[in-house]
Amino acid sequence: MSVIPWPLKPMSPPTPSGRAQHGAAVASASAAPAGHRGRAPAAPEATAGPDDTAAMAAALMQSRQTILPKRLGAPGPNVAELAAILEAAAHAPDHGQLQPWRFVLVPDTARTLLADVFALALQERDPEATPEQIEQAREKAYRSPVLLLAVVDSARGDADIDLAERLVSAGCAIQNMLLMATAQGFGSALTSGKALKAASLRALFRLGCDEQALCFVSIGTVVSRKGARVRPAASSYVSTLDEHRGILPGF
């Protein structure tokens, strides 16, 4: 079911020939057709050393891309796969071990409630919204087999740990989940929107006064996808503090 072997199991350092064989297996998995969820070629039995582990991690991160909810269909993760995705969040950095974030699963049986909230939020923002626009807002609640709301708490635990750190932790937790979903062969996306701040949505999800709805996480089988976007080079977003010349571009 996995696109690449997972979890990783580091073993003894590989021989040059073993490394080449494993690299070919990762390349083959990365080149699989869009939406393919077949089992990847088996990795060599003998070795999976540090170099191979890094290559597999790189292949996983580089294969993750945003697949809009309208491009995600059934089947979604089964119970065991969803549990693995959710458990991945627990491995995020968390200063003070506050666990300042949580996730609310929105099953199919509750999508109508969310659709009603989306429609109401639109009408509150735009009293002149057309029936077609209202229906489009409602329809968003039914996309993707798995839908989760990410929630962050600005006050839980140590008050000296500010919101910025809590948001970083939540972002890392979400990225862990997206990477696990990618490793399982699923597509995923984060979505937001003005409805996240609506009183009706806060009431539906019973958010506390110090909590905010961060984003929705959608997961499912890729039905269609756009081409992968070109990622920026590290040199475009990294600079170096030089003791004599100040901040210099690159690293």
Language-model segments: residues:
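A glycine-rich helix N-cap at a beta->alpha junction
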Residues: 138-140, 204-230
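Helix-biased detector of long, well-ordered alpha-helical tracts
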Residues: 68, 154-159, 242-251
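Short, charged/polar surface micro-motifs in flexible loops or helix N-caps
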Residues: 108-113, 119-120, 154-156, 199, ...
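N-terminal amphipathic, basic helical "cap/leader" segment at the start of enzyme domains
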Residues: 2-143, 250-251
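Phosphate/diphosphate-binding glycine-rich loops and adjacent basic-rich segments that engage nucleotide
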Residues: 227-251
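A structural motif
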Residues: 143-149
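Small-aliphatic-rich amphipathic alpha-helix that forms the alpha element of a beta-alpha
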Residues: 89, 148, 154-203
